[in-house]
Every structure is written in structure tokens, then in C-alpha cells.
Amino acid sequence: MQFAATYPLAQIRRVQIYNNIKRYRETELDKILQETGGSFVFGGPIYLGNLTACCHLKGDGVVYGAPDYHVWGMAWGTDAQDYAMEWLPCGADNYVECVALVVEGEPLAAPHYQPDMGGRRPRQAIGTKEGRFAYLVTQTPYTPEELRDVLAAAGWDSAVMLDGGGSVCYRDRAGNGTGTTPAR
């Protein structure tokens, strides 16, 4: 199962980083849609069990993750019209990072990630394609390098892989979606 789309930035009112302090499970995304009024929702970056973000993460001006390094990630303002890949941390109202795969139209030769992010697993990614907001959520197991190659071949200008494996999830207003681990 796979969910993927691109949207012109002019059609997007908001891209929200939802801080899941209520600990909704991957199978409860409909609750997040109801709470936020969003059109669709999917998983994000890596979090520890105590809800601490492992990677650079900022939502509505609140920094949730600030590791001591710089890296490429997706950043945007309150209305998402400036949604683009930026060098993080940066001054944008919102940003997210996990594993950069495509930067300025070029696939990264050696994406940087820890061993637990490797291997073949379901994956999710965000980025841009032809100046549009792009996302992919797939149950197809890919290594980070295979996902990079798939996104680059599809013409993505920028891509950041988010958390994968059992954290891969998607739900839209029509009820379409997936949550990989109902027991989580």
C-alpha cells in the first residue's frame, strides 16, 4: 500500500507539526485529523519514549529537538508558502529533519543515519517536487538508499526520510490509510 501526492504551495493553508503529547497510536490518526481539521496526516521524525525528538524539529516557533549539529531539512513559515529545504537549524517557524536523501535535485551519495534507521522497512518521506509540497508513505520495504533512488528517479527536488518501520502511518479524510503496527 502506498500514498503519495504533490500539492502546489498556493493550495496549502498550513503544514502542521503535531506534537503528539496525547500519545495517539499509529492506528488512531483519525483522532488527530478531527482535532486539527487537517486533510491528511502521516508520521514524522524519530522520538524517544519520553517524547523527546531525536532530530531537529520545530513547530509553530517551539523547538522540540535541537541536536548539536547542522543538517539539511524541510522548513516553512506559518502559511507554508516558503516551504523548502534549508540548512538546519534556521529561523523558520517550522522545520523537520531526519535523514536527508535529495538536496537541490541531487541524490546524496551517502545519506547520514544511525544503523537502526537502515535495512529494508516501510518508509515515509516529505520534500518538494517541481516546487510543490510532496510526500510519500509506503508499506514497500526500502533501504534509505533505495528510497533515495526512487524519489530522485521520480523527480523530487528535495527529500527527507522520516521515521520508518512500525512508525509508518497515513490517514486522510476519506478514511484511506494504514498503520503498520496495530499493537503499538
Describe each region flagged by the PLM.
Residues 1-184:
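Gly/Ser/Thr/Pro-rich low-complexity, intrinsically disordered segments
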